[in-house]
Amino acid sequence: MASGQMAPSLLRRPITFVSSCPPALRSFGALCPPTGSTDLIGGTGRDILIAAAPARRAPLHATLPLLRSLHTSPAPQLSASHQHQAQQQQQQTKQPQQPYDPQQDQVPSTSTASSSKPAADPVYNLPNAVSVARLVSGPLIGYWLVQGHYEAATLALAVSGASDWLDGWLARRLGASSVFGSYLDPLADKVLIGCVAAALLMNGAMPGWVAGVVVGRDVLLVAGSFVFRLRGFGWRWPGAAAFFRTVDTSAAAAGAATGAANGVASGGGGGGEGVSFMRPLLISKANTVLQLLLLGGYLLRGMDGGAGLQLLLPGGGGEELIMGLELATAATTVASGLAYGTMAVQGKLFK
């Protein structure tokens, strides 16, 4: 074979150009240099004639999806509230993690959280202290009367009687009203009046029928208030703490629920938490004032043969005054007793 001619096997040998584009873009001519194949058609010596085939370009419908996939959409615009939340999240991530506290996982009691009123009432307060002092003074005044110390007994009765107004005023002024105080206040009055009346009856300074009306009515009122309060607990003694609501106990909560159920069933307030305060009546307050005035009149009459009464009323009329106080006291005693009985039947004895 002549040197200027090529071998026949080389005349039509195809040569394929390899593109340097990535494989994903290699088939798209719009993005890469043209690719194609060539044929050796001849040549002499070192000269080779190459006939290049036309380049193959990808169709348009195949190129558009790739262009869309390469397009990066702009970041969405956040509103002011979203930006604020994002800033808060960044600040929280920067804060150091607090140590785990097991007490934070404790769930509060349902009865304590749902109750609108405090589960326990204050007991050790100034109004209750005044009531306790009046209660203790009753036996002391009675003892002085039996011993014949009318002057000291009269002064102590005046101070104790004034304390009946003082403890109520302090409770309202200080906001220290309580279930325990609503029972302690009238109980102290009854103990004071009962002890003085019993001592005067022993000395013969007070008629028996007046003492019977006064003391009998007070005993019935005190006993009745406790009975109706106990009915609110389903006739079961819950303990003194739950009865007077002085501490927060499960028994008190159970008694309150029982009292509410019994109150609804009986059509009245049975003494549960919602109606636990003993309701004082105006006629009962007037009766207490008349009783104290009557006892004071007996003490003045018994002081040195009636010298105290003559000192109070120099012009006379002391006996007539005492007789009028006896009638007024007896009338208001009976009226207040009937009023309390009616309220108890109607379920309105407690508030």
Swiss-Prot record:
Protein name (record): Cardiolipin synthase (CMP-forming)
Pfam families: CDP-OH_P_transf
Chain spans, region Disordered: 74-120
Cofactor(s) this protein requires: Mn(2+)
Enzymatic class: transferase
Entry's EC annotation: 2.7.8.41
Top-level taxonomic group: Eukaryota
Membrane topology: Multi-pass membrane protein
Function of the molecule: Catalyzes the synthesis of cardiolipin (CL) (diphosphatidylglycerol) by specifically transferring a phosphatidyl group from CDP-diacylglycerol to phosphatidylglycerol (PG). CL is a key phospholipid in mitochondrial membranes and plays important roles in maintaining the functional integrity and dynamics of mitochondria under both optimal and stress conditions. Cannot catalyze the phosphatidyl group transfer from one PG molecule to another to form CL.
Phylogenetic classification of the source organism: Eukaryota, Viridiplantae, Chlorophyta, core chlorophytes, Chlorophyceae
Protein family membership: Belongs to the CDP-alcohol phosphatidyltransferase class-I family.
GO biological process terms, semicolon-separated: cardiolipin biosynthetic process
An annotated Gene Ontology molecular function: cardiolipin synthase (CMP-forming)
InterPro entries according to UniProt: CDP-alcohol_PTase-I, CDP-OH_P_trans, CDP-OH_PTrfase_TM_dom, CDP_ALCOHOL_P_TRANSF_CS
UniProt feature, compositional bias: Low complexity: 76-120
Reactions catalysed according to its record: a CDP-1,2-diacyl-sn-glycerol + a 1,2-diacyl-sn-glycero-3-phospho-(1'-sn-glycerol) = a cardiolipin + CMP + H(+)
Subcellular location: Mitochondrion inner membrane
Residues spanning the membrane: 139-159, 191-211, 251-271, 280-300, 321-341
One cellular component term from this protein's GO annotations in UniProt: mitochondrial inner membrane
Keywords, alphabetical: Lipid biosynthesis, Lipid metabolism, Membrane, Mitochondrion, Mitochondrion inner membrane, Phospholipid biosynthesis, Phospholipid metabolism, Transferase, Transit peptide, Transmembrane, Transmembrane helix
Principal location listed in the UniProt entry: mitochondrion
